[in-house]
Amino acid sequence: MAVFIGATGTDIGKTLFSSLILGKYGKSLGLKYFKPVQTGNDSDRVTLMNLTGLHESYFLKNYYSLSFAGSPHYASELEGVEIDSDELSRHLYSIRDEKIIVEGAGGLLVPLTRKILTLELVRQSEIPLILVAPVSLGAINQTLLAIEAVQNRKIDLKGIYFIGIPDKTTEDNIRTITEWSGVTLLGNFFLNSKEKMSRERFQIECLSRFDQCEVIKKMFV
C-alpha cells in the first residue's frame, strides 16, 4: 500500500520523516520514494539519497520538477509549465496498492494549480495519509485545522507523527492534539537543533530511534 506524507505546513519535517521510513525499511520491504511535484530543484530527492545511501532505483522520478522554490501553482506559472492535475491524480490512483512513500509539496492546503489543492489530489488518489506535525508553540492550532480539513474530505488518516525541536509546550501540545482529534499518535522524533544532518548521524542515531514499536512498518507489510 502507498502512503501519502503530508504536513501542516512547509519545512515541518516531511522529508526527514520520509527519509526515516525509507532508510529503515527501504531494502527489507522494497519501498520506493516518490515526490510528484518538486519545487526548488531536486533538493528533497537528493536529501533522501544522501541520508539513506540507497541506490537511485529506490527513488522514482518527479512528475513535475520546478526550479522556483514556492507553491507549485505559482512556480509552474513562472516557468510556463502546466500541471495536469487530472493526469497526476490518475497516476497516483494507479499506484495506490504499491509500496511507495508519496511526499507532498508544502502543506496540505497548498494549491497545485489555480483550481486544485494538494489535499484534493490526495482524496482523488485514495491513498491513505500520514500527517507530519510540529511540536513547538502554535502546533495545536495548525494541526487541528489540518486534521479537520482531512476529515471533512473523508480521507483515510492513518495517524500523526510529530517532528521538531521540543520546547516547554511540546508535551502538552502532543497530548492536547491527540485528545481533541482522536487521531492515532504514530510517534515523535525530537531534534536537538536545525543543523544539517550527516549520513553517519542519520544511520547510527536516527534509525535506531525511529519506529521502535514498528507501527509504521506494519502499514507496508
UniProtKB/Swiss-Prot annotation:
Pathway: Cofactor biosynthesis; biotin biosynthesis; biotin from 7,8-diaminononanoate: step 1/2
Gene designation: bioD
Residues annotated for Mg(2+) binding in this entry: T15, D44, E103
Subunit structure: Homodimer.
Catalytic activity: (7R,8S)-7,8-diammoniononanoate + CO2 + ATP = (4R,5S)-dethiobiotin + ADP + phosphate + 3 H(+)
SUPFAM superfamilies, per the entry: P-loop containing nucleoside triphosphate hydrolases
Positions of ATP binding: D11, I12, G13, K14, T15, L16, D44, E103, G104, A105, G106
Gene source species: Leptospira borgpetersenii serovar Hardjo-bovis (strain JB197)
Described function: Catalyzes a mechanistically unusual reaction, the ATP-dependent insertion of CO2 between the N7 and N8 nitrogen atoms of 7,8-diaminopelargonic acid (DAPA, also called 7,8-diammoniononanoate) to form a ureido ring.
Regions that span the bilayer: none
Residues reported in the UniProt entry to bind substrate: T39
Short name of any one Pfam family annotated for the protein: AAA_26
Catalytic residues (positions): K35
Name by which UniProt lists this protein: ATP-dependent dethiobiotin synthetase BioD
UniProt GO BP: biotin biosynthetic process
Cellular component aspect of the GO annotation: cytosol
